[in-house]
Amino acid sequence: MKNLFNKIFNPEKYLADKRLKIIEKDKKIFKEKYEKQINDVQKSLKNKDEISFLHAGHIGDIINALPVVKEISKSHKCNLIIQTNLPSPDVYSSHPAGKFYLNKKIYDMLYPLLIKQSYIEKVEIYNSQPIDINFNLIRELPINLCFDNKRYWFHIAGIQVDLSKKYLEVEDHANLKNRITICRSLRYQNPFIDYSFLEKYDDIYYIGVLEEYEILKKIIKNLKFYECKDFLEMAMIIKSSKVHIGNQTLGIDIAEGLKSPRIVEVSPYFPTVQIHGENGYEFYFQTHFEKYFNVLNNK
């Protein structure tokens, strides 16, 4: 009854009380369920020579956690354990893993890129192995995730990394070189942006999902499609690209790791991707998109 009275006659107090209840609830959840797990990470880093990381995806999130893995590998042997078939609450039809963060098919495509990294000792599917750092906690903790998603993993491991440095290692692609490449998911598209100006450029390749390509080809009529056999090949193509363009999706996450020329279309509704280091730009608006593209394309 008191809450109803305040809601009607004292809305400021009602909102303050509501906010306080949320805070107290979050504190209780953290204390009872997560504080020990966060503290135990530091004990493992201090006392162990070998560290096993658990990650269930999405694919880009696994790539974005690699700077932390690479940093820890300077003093520890590092194993990356991938959990497949963890149900995702955000199911959408175009996602290649369907109702999961990551399925076995996607794992098989990701494995060659992960095992290529010299700082990772081994990559395995999760089968109840002992885990020291559980990156999956980031989706459970009572915190707001609307910040740079490459920094999520800092808050699980307690490790701060210079994100301007490369953290992916691949060779150049043998055939597809010096092209404009695009990978633009149907999620997180910016409604202020139009890609049609790219139609005047030759040799533009889409290297993502076929459904996404078919939609973008209606806008860029001369857009070509290249089907990557796995994400290692995708990374090799991105490394060899003149410019890679994308929104908040795997292509940009890979380009960030390589520090190759890249431009990211940022979602105005969930801006969790930021550029770090050389050869990269991010944009919200069309005029900046075209400006940054010209800067990189004319280098």
Describe each PLM feature range:
Residues 1-299:
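Catalytic machinery of carbohydrate-active enzymes
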